[in-house]
Amino acid sequence: MSDSKDSKGKAPQKPNDAEQTPGGKLTPQAAEALLENNPSLKNELGGLDKDKALEALRKMDISELLTGLSLTGKNKKDMAAFKFWQTQPVPRFDEAASNAAGGPIKMIDPEKVSKEPDALIEGFEWTTLDLTNEEELRELWDLLTYHYVEDDNAMFRFRYSKSFLHWALMSPGWRKEWHVGVRATKSRKLVASISGVPTQIRVRGQKIKVTEINFLCIHKKLRSKRLAPVLIKEITRRCYLNGIYQAIYTAGVVLPTPVSSCRYYHRPLDWLKLYEVGFSPLPRGSTKARQITKNHLPSHTSTPNLRPMEAKDVDAVHDLLERYLNQFDIHQAFTREEIDHWLVYKESPQKEQVIWSYVVEDPETHKITDFFSFYNLESTVIQHPKHDCVRAAYLYYYATETAFLDDQKALKNRLQMLMNDALILAKKAQFDVFNALTSHHNPLFLEQLKFGAGDGQLHFYLYNYRTAPIAGGVNEKNLPDENRMGGVGVVML
């Protein structure tokens, strides 16, 4: 949820050469770093007595909420002013992190929700995007392509395909009115957007209807107009009118207040290409040949009875995934229709493939015992003489019957086999890098399968819902920790 790369926390970022090692408590130095890396916090708390300004920040549970706060300036761009978030139904920084009482923060009376949007600044007007209209889809694609997500050094920029936008924004139950845009009145040019899709999630067993907020994007020339809070308020109003009072979103910046925080990991599939475009460094003392050899993958998968997922597998995968995700504190509560939409590739000559899903079918019982999936998100390589894009595969959902055996060693072995096959299949599909978070049971295989730590952190947020902090799969040193699993079981695009 942001007009900058930091809102995603997953821009095409370089792996991190050096480990960050923030302490388990928010020290005065770390609190000052938090202010430094979030300009709006610094600006709006700057008028207060320094000790008072830092006191609220020190009350945060750093090990749960801010593990791995980037101290390298990666959090420089703010999604919206800190003052704005003080007016919203979100947990405050100074609330006790151990408060386990879960539930809505504010009860919404739909009769009191405005039927009309707030007025925009002169020269701009609201619009509702029709993504079934090829021209309006192209406008959104154009805005996102040139103004959405870019790395700090302007070397890489996300390149969402139109097929990806259809997949991401037209899931079951999608509403046209939740695809919000802002146009320049005179030119009619689309200059800002925010989108949401409806779904249900479970938070510590409580099933709630939410809107997944995404693609908050503002034209670079309008970043000073403070449109982000206005866009957030407008999508909130439209959701309220449809009876949805909670939302889930992610950001790479620290806002009030993360429910969890995961770290990105990257596994090179074409190391030489990643090195040539500046994504992967050449480690000191190593050589190109050594790095290519280190990241080499077998030509063939090793899991018996592995095959691409088909429409006939939807019910079995739905059952397996639902049982698996129930092990996590926060996760999506999928419907059968959502499984079909999100996981089944429907070949079409007009559309690029976005999702790759595979199942393991027992040849005797024909039961689906395992499945995994990954999706495609390319990045443009800006002004490079040889390469124009990096193809990144993002680990999506997976599940395995082995997870129910109460045998972590067996689960670790099974996931390492499955995920190594995912890497092989992604390599065969011409992907250059495979990305994954420390969510789910990912700490069981990330380091063993030669994923490298990234400098991207993804913070998870709930709007108008309070719950105690949820483990993000990392420890106080921001490293994958098998003892910190079982928290995040949701994947946000």
UniProtKB/Swiss-Prot annotation:
Region (Disordered): 1-30
Residues spanning the signal sequence: none
InterPro entries: Acyl_CoA_acyltransferase, NMT, NMT_C, NMT_CS, NMT_N
One Pfam family of this chain: NMT_C
GO CC annotation, single: cytosol
Reactions accelerated catalytically: N-terminal glycyl-[protein] + tetradecanoyl-CoA = N-tetradecanoylglycyl-[protein] + CoA + H(+)
Transferase listed as a keyword: yes
Class of enzymatic activity (EC top level): transferase
Enzyme Commission number: 2.3.1.97
Major localization listed first in the record, in broad terms: cytoplasm
Catalytic residue list: 493 (proton acceptor)
Record has Transferase as a keyword: yes
Binding site for tetradecanoyl-CoA: 82-85, 216-218, 224-228
Subunit structure, interactors included: Monomer.
Role noted for this protein: Adds a myristoyl group to the N-terminal glycine residue of certain cellular proteins.
Family: Belongs to the NMT family.
UniProt-recorded name of the protein: Glycylpeptide N-tetradecanoyltransferase
Source organism per UniProt: Emericella nidulans (strain FGSC A4 / ATCC 38163 / CBS 112.46 / NRRL 194 / M139)
